[in-house]
């Protein structure tokens, strides 16, 4: 007896899991040729710029020719992904508000001075990429700390209006995979999921073993991959609630009982950021969303990165904040080395995101092959707060739409042209620049 998709979806049950698997078992033969476009867009933001002092070699920007170039120490973690990345020199965000963290954050994804436009992530979520159960996913790690003002955020649903990211991975998990749903880009939910006492997967897939036994090898492998990846995320989130983070209440009975002040303990920041990355990747693997923003902290960050345990920047009884380190003054100042190590750590988290996408098969390649992942910060050199030679890197093959493994010298082009080229690679060929001050598509970046 042939097992059709209707039978599988009926057996799956649970709206939050039915939607992700709706396209899982589509036969490869049914998929015809498609244009070279990306399937998803992810932004990974880190605060306070990079070590690129004027007149000195940048520790962040690649150097060399288009196809023969070297990665500096801050980018060492990207060596395994070099062929899947596009690097840039010379991109500028323009002179307006130059020297300003808030001014940079406002222009970063909107391409418009003062944040006077919809950000690219929001535009793509409602246009080029089509419908998804969750149109847009905006997750943060200590991004809303200290009642952050709107100019601390980088995602603009409309001109002059930002939205706050969700800093709690357990809340995000419940909204994405739990009953009742909810808006993943902020707001409140009416129903939460207990990540400690219940397995959402097992509850929704009671008779999955029977279904699995009737699948072919290819479909069975796809199902196992998605289920195991989802369980891995669930285990991580359960760990956050049940004791992997030592100060959390081990007898926690529901998400609503979490001491949310623990979300802003810097010693927990690395685990929380990893959880948000995992949630973003898994949501996309399940087809829940096609656009995501992961915001690591906020500009002018008070994040004490010297409290990150088991990292090269860990220094007990020594406080070194991200923003504090960025004002290194001169390279001989010890803050400069601390600042450089902090930037290396952020790039390592970006590399982790790329690795998670690369580890998941999709079609004839991987999720990374079909994605565009933008690494960005709101300023260039942290000491001068420059908006020139911005630290932008693209990861992923965009479904064949981008030429990667290259270093592009953009000779002072406005970053609006990069945003427009990204939109083009996502399938929106109606625009060539996004925002203001642009000239058009960046030469050579599109395949």
PLM segments and residue spans:
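Ligand-binding pockets and gating/stacking loops
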Residues: 1-447
């Amino acid at each position: 007896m042939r097992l059709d998709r209707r039978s599988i979806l009926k057996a799956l049950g649970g709206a939050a899991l039915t939607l992700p698997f709706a396209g899982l078992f589509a036969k490869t033969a049914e998929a015809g040729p498609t244009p070279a476009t990306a399937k998803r867009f992810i932004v990974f933001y880190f605060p306070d710029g990079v070590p690129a002092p004027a007149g000195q070699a940048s520790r962040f920007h690649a150097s060399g020719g288009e196809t023969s170039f070297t990665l500096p120490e801050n980018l060492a973690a990207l060596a395994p992904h070099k062929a899947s990345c596009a690097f840039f020199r010379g991109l500028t965000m323009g002179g307006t508000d130059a020297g300003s963290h808030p001014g940079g954050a406002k222009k970063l994804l909107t391409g418009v001075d003062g944040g006077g436009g919809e950000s690219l992530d929001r535009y793509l979520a409602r246009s080029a990429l089509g419908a998804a159960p969750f149109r847009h996913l905006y997750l943060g790690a200590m991004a809303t700390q200290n009642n952050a003002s709107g100019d601390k955020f980088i995602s603009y649903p409309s001109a002059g209006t930002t939205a706050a990211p969700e800093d709690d991975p357990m809340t995000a998990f419940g909204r994405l995979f739990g009953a009742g749903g909810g808006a993943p880009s902020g707001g409140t939910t009416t129903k939460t999921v207990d990540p400690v006492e219940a397995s959402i997967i097992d509850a929704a897939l009671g008779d999955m073993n029977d279904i699995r036994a009737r699948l072919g090898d290819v479909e069975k492998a796809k199902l196992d991959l998605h289920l195991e990846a989802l369980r891995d995320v669930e285990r991580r989130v359960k760990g956050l609630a049940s004791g992997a983070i030592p100060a959390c209440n081990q007898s926690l009975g529901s998400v609503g009982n979490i001491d949310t002040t623990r979300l802003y303990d810097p010693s927990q920041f690395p685990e929380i950021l990893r959880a948000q990355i995992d949630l973003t990747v898994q949501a996309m693997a399940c087809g829940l969303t096609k656009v995501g923003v992961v915001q690591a902290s906020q500009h002018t960050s008070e994040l004490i990165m010297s409290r990150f345990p088991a990292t090269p920047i860990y220094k007990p009884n020594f406080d070194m904040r991200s923003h504090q380190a960025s004002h290194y003054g001169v390279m001989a100042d010890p803050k400069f080395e601390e600042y450089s190590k902090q930037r290396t750590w952020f790039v390592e988290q970006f590399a982790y995101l790329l690795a998670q996408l690369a580890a998941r098969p999709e079609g004839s390649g991987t999720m990374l092959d079909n994605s565009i992942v933008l690494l960005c910060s709101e300023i260039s050199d942290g000491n001068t707060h420059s908006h020139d030679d911005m630290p932008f890197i693209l990861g992923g093959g965009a479904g064949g739409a981008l030429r990667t493994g290259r270093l592009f010298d953009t000779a002072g082009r406005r970053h609006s042209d990069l945003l427009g080229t990204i939109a083009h690679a996502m399938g929106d060929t109606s625009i060539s620049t996004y925002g203001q001050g642009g000239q058009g598509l960046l030469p050579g970046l599109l395949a």
